[in-house]
Amino acid sequence: VSERLVLLLSGPNLNLLGEREPEIYGSDSLAHHVATAVETAAASGLVVEHLQSNHEGDLVDAIHAARGRAAAIIINPAALTHYAWSLHDALATFDGPVVELHLSNPNAREAWRHTSVVSPVATGTIAGFGGFGYRLAVEAVIHLLSP
């Protein structure tokens, strides 16, 4: 396991950040948020590897590949949060901290967004802080990986 590697996963439609519903998700692009995570991690000697996919199976494959390789996972599962049991099961096999991340606060939105199938296998969840959540998620990983 690389004690320096953090896998950052972004789910469906996050490639459209900055264009899609900016009143909810803000005007910054996914690339901007990833750069924030990379910079925050680098300041503590960590390396972020990012994957965005609109396909659940790609994210599951990335989680499987991270086993024995990455020290931690940060995941913004987007809409998959609410029904992607395959993500839940894959994350349950990962032996390291998992931080669930959301730009908005799902519990302050529509009722169908109130259930997360990721939360039961996450070490913790950061939600509702917009783009600042990416910095917070990396800081949480730094804390969780500290001896």
Question: What are these model-predicted stretches?
Answer:
Residues 58-62:
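Short acidic active-site motifs
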